[in-house]
Amino acid sequence: MKVVVLAGGISTERDVSLSSGAGIYQALKENGHRVILLDIFLGLPDVQEPLEELFDREFDWAASVRGVAEKAPDLERVKAQRPGFRSLLGPNVLELCSLCDMVFLGLHGANGEDGRIQALFDLMGIRYTGTGHTGSALCMDKNITKQMFRGFGIPTPPSITVKKGEAYELPETIGFPCMVKTCCGGSSVGVYRVEDVFGLDRALAKAFSYEDEVLIERCIPGREFSIAVVEGKALPIIEIAPISGFYDYKNKYQAGSTVETCPADLPQNITARMQKHAEDACAVLGIEGYARVDFMLDERSGEDYALEANTLPGMTPTSLMPQEAAALGMSYAELCEWILNVSLKKYEPGGNRP
C-alpha cells in the first residue's frame, strides 16, 4: 500500500508529531508498505522526478527527525524556512496525498488534530486515518468536550472558561488548587497547576500567551490514567506517575521523568468502570477508529473523572497508546498496521465515508 505519513506542521506539538511520524514511517516500511514521511508545513520543494516515483525511492525519510526537546519548539524559526508563505500546506503535500492509498496522520495540535485537514481531505476524496472533521473539532476544544461529557453523564471536573480581557469569578465548586489550561492546546503546553489567587493571575497570563480562551478546572487529587479505545473497545489502562510535579510537557517527553504502569494496578470494578467511561466518551464525541481518553481518579472519593479525548494520540514508540497495545502482546509495528486497517474500514461499502 502507498502511504503518506503526515507530521510536523505549525503547532506547539510539532516535535512530538515528527517523532510520532518517524516511528510510524519506520514501522509501516518494515511492514512492507511504500511509505513517504512528509512535514505538512515544509512539504517537499524542488522535486525533479515524477512524484509517483518517490514512493519507491531508496531514501530514509526519517533521517533528519530528532528527539523531543525539553521545551516546545520555536515556531518562528520553522516559519522562516518558508519565507512569505500563504498556505499552511507545504509544496507537493496535497499532490502526494492525492497519489497515495492512505494518509496516516501523525499530526498533533492545531491544523492537524482540529478537523481542518480532515475536512479538506474529505472534500478531496483523500483517505486518512482516524476521526473525521466533526469529531476532531469537538475534541480539540476542551470546553466543548467537557460540555459533551456533562450532557451525556460522563463525570468530568467542574470548570469555567475565561476569555482574554474578560472579568471572571472563580466558583466555589472549583476553588484551589486548580488547573489552568488552554482550551485547544495539547501535550500539556499552556497547562499550569495553581495554588492561590496570585498564582492564578500569573498562570492566566502565561496561558493567554498561547490562546485567547482558557479553561480553569478543579484540580482532582489522586492518580492519573489514560485509556486508548480502538473500534469502540478500551485497551488496558495505563497509569501515569510523574517523579515530580504534574504530567507537563517536560515530564511527558523527557526520559526518566515519569513512571508509567500498564496494566494499571486497580481493582477490577474501577478498571471496568473507567474503561466503560472511556468507551462512552468516544461514542459521544463521534470518534472513528481510535482515540485516547485521559482520566483522574479521586483519591478521596474513588470517583474517576474524564479530562479530555485525544483523536490523534501520541505515537512515538514509547507513547501511552503503544504501551497499552504492548500489554495486549502487540508490537509497535502491529499497532500501526491495526490502525491502518481499522481506518480503511470507514471507506469500505457501508462505511461512513464516500
Show where each model-derived region lies:
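Conserved metal-phosphate-binding beta-hairpin within the catalytic cores
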Residues: R218, I227-V229, C282-M315, A325
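ATP-binding N-terminal substructure of ATP-dependent carboxylate-amine bond-forming enzymes
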Residues: M1-T134, L138-M140, I144, G151, ...
